[in-house]
Swiss-Prot record:
Keywords: Cytoplasm, Elongation factor, GTP-binding, Hydrolase, Magnesium, Metal-binding, Nucleotide-binding, Protein biosynthesis
Keyword GTP-binding: yes
Protein name: Elongation factor Tu
NCBIfam families according to UniProt: EF-Tu (TIGR00485), PRK00049.1 (NF000766), PRK12735.1 (NF009372), PRK12736.1 (NF009373), small_GTP (TIGR00231)
Family: Belongs to the TRAFAC class translation factor GTPase superfamily. Classic translation factor GTPase family. EF-Tu/EF-1A subfamily.
Role, per record: GTP hydrolase that promotes the GTP-dependent binding of aminoacyl-tRNA to the A-site of ribosomes during protein biosynthesis.
Record's catalysed reaction(s): GTP + H2O = GDP + phosphate + H(+)
Length: 402
């Protein structure tokens, strides 16, 4: 039964902290059923709108970095927080979603069917979560209702999950594992509804509040540069994180070995003067003593000594399939595409892991990239792989080499 959302203050309580979360795990282990169960159980408390399996499973397409991904976003609240929850129908959609950062997860709910235990995609999703920087996950051990009287087997599955999490550097010993039945909760059985509420309590307490981008060091990617006669050089772009005030010192980073120091002497947005530019703003900043030739699109303006340009790094990449607009053929070790970071692309070469000869469209692989010019990147930076102006892959920097 759908519960009508009451239009009280509670629904749009801005004082609740916002967290992005998602369900991950092997195919048919119950991710979408659990997503439906969470919304349905919380709807009974007036904290969500009940969603059934079919409406979540018919996930709309969205594009991120030129890649089509089927993702279902639903929202719900607990007494403490407001959540945006992403669930993907297909395995390839999970990989694309995580690598492109279409939904940056602050934490994840790993769903494992107790009847099967961890399976190949369970491992792959845990590894991907580690690579793209998901800090913590809570485990829902599903389908417990099918294993009545088999307590020992369930205990063994739990041990296996904890060992698996620890092997990928998650805190396997302390990760909450909730035993339940998503289907039972969706059918309104009180003992299983209680388990969904227990799961959400664990998510509330174990998934840490993310450091909001406002608290991080200032960084703005340069999109455009122009000169104002008599005043100097202005760079425009979107502030990716942090904030900057008038007369603060910053560095221009990228393309050159050494950053250029300068001071911000003016900040404008929509032709209005500002004292501060902050994360999310599309702003223009006036830079003291900077010639037009000293700065270009693709560089970043950042708080001094907080980001350095690099040319070589390891990355997790997804190669688009032909049907997704990707290549029709594999690529080999001499492949030199463009790597698109923030506002610009730079040519680079690739090295495969030992034993790999090629990458076939649809593959999800780890490789090493070496760019022809240094770019401001760090662990977790997202990029697209392009050739001839079209996107053929997406990646996340997993480790800086030089």
């Amino acid at each position: 039964m759908a519960v009508v959302k009451t239009t009280g203050k509670k629904d749009f309580d801005r004082s609740k902290e916002h967290i992005n979360i998602g369900t991950i795990g092997h195919v048919d282990h119950g991710k979408t059923t659990l997503t439906a169960a969470i919304s349905t159980v919380l709807a009974k408390k007036g904290l969500a709108e009940a969603k059934d399996y079919a409406s979540i499973d018919a996930a709309p397409e969205e594009k991120a970095r030129g890649i089509t991904i089927n993702t279902a976003h639903i929202e719900y609240s607990t007494d403490k927080r407001h959540y945006a929850h992403v669930d993907c129908p297909g395995h390839a959609d999970y990989i694309k979603n995580m690598i492109t950062g279409a939904a940056q997860m602050d934490g994840a709910i790993l769903v494992v069917a107790a009847t099967d235990g961890p399976m190949p995609q369970t491992r792959e999703h845990i590894l991907l979560s580690k690579q793209v920087g998901v800090p913590k996950m809570v485990v829902f051990l599903n389908k417990i209702d099918l294993l009545e009287g088999e307590e020992e087997m369930v205990d063994l599955v739990e041990v296996e999950i904890r060992e698996l999490l620890s092997s990928y550097d998650f805190d396997g010993d302390n990760t909450p594992i909730i035993r339940g039945s998503a289907r039972g909760a969706l059918e309104g059985k009180p003992e299983w509804e209680a388990k969904v509420l227990e799961l959400m309590d664990a998510v509330d307490s174990y998934i840490d509040s993310p450091v909001r981008e406002m608290d991080k060091p200032f960084l703005m990617a340069v999109e455009d540069v122009f000169t104002i006669t008599g005043r100097g050089t202005v760079a425009t772009g979107k502030v990716e994180r942090g904030q900057v005030k008038l007369n603060e010192e910053v560095e221009i980073v990228g393309y050159r070995e050494e950053p250029k120091k300068t001071v911000i002497t003016g900040i404008e947005m929509f032709n209005k003067n500002l004292q501060t530019a902050m994360a999310g703003d599309n702003a223009g900043v006036l830079l003291r003593g900077v010639d037009r030739k000293d700065i270009e699109r693709g560089q970043v303006i950042a708080k001094p000594k907080t980001i350095i340009p690099h040319t070589k790094f390891k990355a997790a990449i997804y190669a688009l399939k032909k049907e997704e607009g990707g290549r029709h053929t594999p690529f080999f070790k001499n492949y030199k595409p463009q790597f698109y970071f923030r506002t610009t692309d730079v040519t680079g070469g690739i090295e495969f892991e030992p034993g790999r000869e090629m990458v076939i469209p649809g593959d999800n692989v780890d490789l090493t990239v070496e760019l022809i010019a240094p770019i401001a990147v760090e662990q977790g930076t997202k990029f697209s792989i392009r050739e001839g102006g079209r996107t053929v892959g997406a990646g996340t920097v997993t480790e800086i080499i030089k």
